Amino acid sequence: MGRKWANIVAKKTAKDGATSKVYAKFGVEIYVAAKQGDPDPESNSALKFVIDRAKQAQVPKHVIDKAIDKAKGNTDETFVEGRYEGFGPNGSMIIVDTLTSNVNRTAANVRTAYGKNGGNMGASGSVSYMFDKKGVIVFEGDDADTVFEQLLEADVEVDDVEAEDGAITVYTAPTDLHKGIQALRDNGIETFKVTELEMIPQSEVTLEGDDLATFEKLVDALEADDDVQKVYHNVADF
């Protein structure tokens, strides 16, 4: 499972990196975190978390610094979080999280992306009840039992710890993600491949042929929108 999450990050970075969209999206997220709190990541845990994730996605330092500098300025640009749920082909479900300065624009764009690419946008709650929000931490290692014990000793609410292909994947309660990361750092883990809040599907579907092609086109269209931060789904091996 650790390889799965690392591969998802690598795939997304490679795909988005060609157009620098991943940089722009992290730039907005960093700006918002810095604007809402202290622009110093050492005293703003939310900002530090976003910066760590940006580094995992290979966002250059100058992009990170530019977003923080913008937050230090007099700009009053406001961003609002949003969520749009919908359906793709053959039982596939999609959750889209956005961060936008223009909610009407974003809602229209997401609805269009669904409608023109083989999907249907549903009502709020129509899909999310089939997903569980969890913290996901991935790093190199193979001793899941020891990691599990270390996290329990640190009073971290852990759902599961898996070891596969030289990587350990930790699933935490969403409220304990930061505590879990710190506990692992306290036990000598310095480098993380993934530290994310994820919506994990309770069950997955497998798509093939035209259905898979349609689904990929739909996800690509959603992720291409500058206001879309995350796309979650229930399709296996995608």
Swiss-Prot record:
* Family membership: Belongs to the TACO1 family. YeeN subfamily.
**Name this protein carries in UniProt:** Probable transcriptional regulatory protein SUB0364
Traced from the root, the source organism's taxonomic lineage reads: Bacteria, Bacillati, Bacillota, Bacilli, Lactobacillales
Q: Which SUPFAM superfamilies match?
A: YebC-like
Any one Pfam family here would be Transcrip_reg
Query: Record's Gene Ontology CC terms?
Result: cytosol
Which species does the entry assign this protein to?
A: Streptococcus uberis (strain ATCC BAA-854 / 0140J)
Q: Where in the cell is it found?
A: Cytoplasm
Q: Which InterPro entries match?
A: Integrase-like_N (IPR017856), TACO1_YebC-like_2nd/3rd_dom (IPR048300), TACO1_YebC_N (IPR049083), Transcrip_reg_TACO1-like (IPR002876), Transcrip_reg_TACO1-like_dom3 (IPR026564), Transcrip_reg_TACO1_YeeN (IPR026562), YebC-like (IPR029072)
For molecular function, the Gene Ontology terms on record are: DNA binding
Task: Give the record's keywords alphabetically.
Answer: Cytoplasm, DNA-binding, Transcription, Transcription regulation
Q: Which GO terms describe its biological process?
A: regulation of DNA-templated transcription
